[in-house]
A protein has these predicted regions:
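STAS-typified acidic loop motif
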Residues: 4-39, 56-58
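Amphipathic alpha-helical interaction surfaces in cytosolic regulatory modules
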Residues: 28-87
Length: 87
């Protein structure tokens, strides 16, 4: 039995055309949830999306691990001549 609360984090995705994906995140992005966020971000890039819009209007907290995921995603997109927009 685990008495620790599960971190709250969720992401929904919406594709806009062939190259753009909106990732609408909610909750907290930290060391416990960053791997799930990284997985979704990397999947979008692997799917050939070169324009990512990250809607963080419902993100309550982000730590340095989450910021690292953002920077790594930005680097990958930049190498592909893509862009990342944070809302």
């Amino acid at each position: 039995m685990n008495d620790f609360p599960q971190p709250k984090f969720e992401v929904s995705e919406t594709d806009v055309g062939e190259r753009t994906r909106i990732l609408d995140a909610a909750g907290e992005i930290h060391v416990g949830t960053a791997p799930a966020f990284s997985e979704r971000l990397n999947a979008a890039i692997a799917d050939g999306k070169t324009a990512l819009v990250l809607d963080f209007s419902r993100v309550e907290f982000i730590d340095s691990t989450g910021l690292s995921v953002l920077l790594n995603g930005l680097r990958r997109l930049t190498r592909r001549k893509g862009s990342l927009v944070l809302v």
